[in-house]
Amino acid sequence: MTPKDKAVQHASHYFNEGGFKKDLSELIAVRTESQNQKYNLSNYYKNNIIPMLKEMGFKCNIIKNSSSEANVFLFAERIENHNFKTILTYGHGDVVLGQNESWEDDLTPYK
C-alpha cells in the first residue's frame, strides 16, 4: 500500500468511525467570540488546535498581534519533502457573538 493509499484509508476510517465529528464538536464547543475578551484565543490554540496539529507532524508557533493582544496568530508548518509542492491554507479561530438566547430551545451555536 502506498503512503497516499494509507493516508486515504486513515482519513476514511477517521471520518466513517466518528472521529471527525467528535473532534469537530469539541472545537465548536469552545467559545472564541472575538467581541468577548474573556475567551482567550491563545488558550484555544494551545489547548485545542496545536495538539491536533502536532499529532500530524506540524511545528507550531503563536505569533503576537501588534494590533490586539487578545487576537494572536497561529503559524503551523509541516514539510514532508522539500521537493513536493507547497500548500498554503488560512483559517481563523474566533467567531462572532453566538447570540445563544436567539436560538431555538433545542439548538445552540456551540454544538
Predicted regions and their residues:
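Acidic/His- and Gly-rich active-site-bordering loop/insert found
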Residues: 2-111
